[in-house]
Amino acid sequence: MPVRFKGISEYRSKYKGRTSRSRSDSPHRRMRLAGLRSDQSGITQEPQFISKRRVPFYPSQVSSSFRWEGRDHSQQQLEKSRSPAVSPVLRATSAERQVTPLAPRDPPEGTTAPSQPPQAEAAQTSTFAVQKQKQALNGINHALRMKAGLRSEHQRNGLNSEYQRQFMWKTPVAESPLLAAHQMLYSNNRAIPPFKTNPVIMESEYKRSFKGSPLPRPPRLRRDVEQYEVPEFLTESKTPEKSKRKKKKKERPHSRKSSPEQEVAYLQQQEVKSPHNLKDPSPKVMRKGKTEYRSNFHSPLQYSYKDGAWLKIKSAKEEVKELRERAEAYKKRAWGTHFSRQHLNQILSDQNWMWEPSSGTSSSSIESEACRSTSHIIEALDLARAGSVRESSSPGHSASVVVSRRSSSGEVGLPEEPTLPVQRKLAWDEEEQLGEREEIVQDRLTDKEGKTRNENGMERNERLNSLESESLSSAEEGSEASVNGGRLPTPKLKTMQTVQRTHHDRTTPSIDFNLHYIAKAANGSLPRSSPVAGLTTVDVLPMREDVWSDEEVTDYRSLKPPKPSRKQQSSQRHKANAAPPANRIQGTMRNAEFQHNGNLGIFRPELFVLPQSDSALSDNDDKMSQISSRSAASCSMASEVLGRAQRRKQEFWGKS
C-alpha cells in the first residue's frame, strides 16, 4: 500500500488564507482587514517573538465575520435563526464589529426569540427564495460579463496581491443582468470595440458661446434715430431674465404688505399662467455678442468723418454752447494779457514814480486823458492839478509849482536825461536853494557826457536866475522866522525797507508793452531808503559849491540870460501840457523802495524805528510838494493804461 502522509505541514498550517476563502461568498459580505486593531479583529493576545526554536502552532482567532467557509450564506442564516442562544464569544465579537457601508445588513445577533411565530418563518422562506433568484441572476451576470470580455467579480487572477484581496471598492458596481453603458467603456477584449467617448472636446469655444444671428430689424425712420441717439445694440444687450424680473416686480407691487387672501389669489393666477410658460420657447437671441466691428462702427447718422477721424455730430444747442465758451475764453485772454489785477496793483502803488515816464508824444495823450478821466482813483491821485489850483491862494507853494512847471517845459527835448526825485520841502522855506543846486549839478553832468544842447542850456540859465532871486528872499524870511523861534516839525516813524522781489521786477510792461530800463547813476546807485531825521546823509551826486572851482562857477554864471517876464512864464505854463511829467523815475525797478511786494498798508511794528535825534532837519515832508510829484507819474500811467484797455475792449469785435 502506498504510504500517505496525513500530517499538516508548517507551511499549510500558517498560510491557508487563499484556500479557506470561498468563491461563492459575495464581496459585499466581507469586512476589510487592513486598518483594524488586533482587538477589533478578535485577536486578544499579542504575537510572540519569532525565535530559532520551533514555535508551537495556535489556531488563528478570527471573528466569524472574517471566516469564509464553503457553505452558502443561506445555510448560515438558517443555523443562526435556529440556534436558541448565542455563544459568549460571538457576543463579544459582534459588539466589536465596525459598522460600515459595506458591512452585511444582518439582523442583530441574539435579538431573535427562541420561539418564532409561523408568520416570521414564512417571511424568512420568502426572503430565501428571493436570494436564490439573485444568485441565479448573478450567474447570468457572470456569463454576460465573460462574453463581453469584462472581468466578473468571481473571476480571480492568481496575481492578486494581498492588498487587492483585502480592500474592496467602497461603491461597488450594482449587480444587474443587463450590461450598463459605463461597464463597457473599459473592455480588455480586443475583439469588442470599446464604446468610449473621445476625451478631447471637439466643440470649439466659438461654437459653444455662439448664440445665433438675431432676427432682421424692421425698417426704422430717420427721425427716430436722431431723436434717440443711444445705439440700439446697447438697449438690446439686456438679458430676458432681467426684464422678466422687472416685469414681476411691476406686476407684484407691495407684496410684503398684502394679506394672505391676496397671496392665495396671486398664486392661483400664477398657476393659470404657468401652462403657457411650460411650452418650449422659440429660439431667441439671449444676448448680443459685442464684436470688433460693432465696437468700432460709427453710424453716419451720428458721426462724420473729418481729417481722418470720426467726430460725433453736435446738435445746435451744443454748437451754441461751444461758441459762447470760445468767446468767453477770447475775452478773458485779451483782458488777462493787456490789463490784469497785477497791473492795477502796480498802478495804484505808491512807488510807481520809480517807473519810467512816457515819451513826449505819449505823455501828451496821458495828460489829456488824465484831465478828461472821471475815475475816482485817478482823481484822488491827481494832486498835481490840485496844487496848481491852489497856486493863487497859497503864495508859499507858488515857487515850487513854478519850478516844476518850468523844469518840465525845459525838459521837453531831453527825455533821456537822468534826474533826481523831487526834493522834500521842510517845515520852513529856508533851504529852497537845494533844488536849484541839484539842477545845476544835473546840467553839469550832462555837459560832461558830451550832450551839447545850447538852446536848452540858455533856457535853464534864465530859469536859474529867476529862481536864485526868489529863493534868496524866501530863505532870508525863513531864517528870520526860524531865529525868532518857530515850531520845529514833529518827527515821524520811519520804516526800514527790506529788499524784496516781486513779479513786477521784470514782467510788468510800460508803454507799448516793452520793458524800459534806466541806467544807474555814474557815481553809484540811489539809496535804498530815505534818510532818517537828524542824521547827516551822503549825497549821491556832488551838490556842494566847493566841489567846483571858482572859474567854472563864474563861467557858468556868465552864460545866464536875463530874467524872463510874467508873460513868458504864462506861455510856458500853457506849453507844459504837452511836456512829459516833471519827475522822472530814478534808479531801476529793482530799487528797494519799489519792491513793496504788496505790503502797503500792513502794519508791522518790527519794521518801524524811532529817530535817534531831533534836529531841525526832519522828514515831515510837505504833502503838496511830495504827493503831487509822485502822483503825477501814477496818474499818467494809470490813465494811459486804462484808456488803452478801454479802447481795446471796445474794438475787440471790430469797430462799430
UniProtKB/Swiss-Prot annotation:
Domain of life: Eukaryota
Motif (ST]-E-Y-X(3)-F motif 1): 161-167
Localization in the cell: Nucleus; Cytoplasm, Cytoskeleton, Microtubule organizing center, Centrosome; Cytoplasm, Cytoskeleton, Microtubule organizing center, Centrosome, Centriole
Family: Belongs to the MDM1 family.
Family matches, as InterPro entries: MDM1 (IPR029136)
Motif ST]-E-Y-X(3)-F motif 3: positions: 291-297
GO MF annotation list: microtubule binding
Coiled-coil intervals, chain numbering: 309-337
Keywords: Coiled coil, Cytoplasm, Cytoskeleton, Microtubule, Nucleus, Repeat
Compositionally biased intervals (Basic and acidic residues): 68-82, 434-465
Biased composition (Low complexity): 111-126, 398-409, 466-482, 625-638
Native organism: Danio rerio
Protein name as it appears in the record: Nuclear protein MDM1
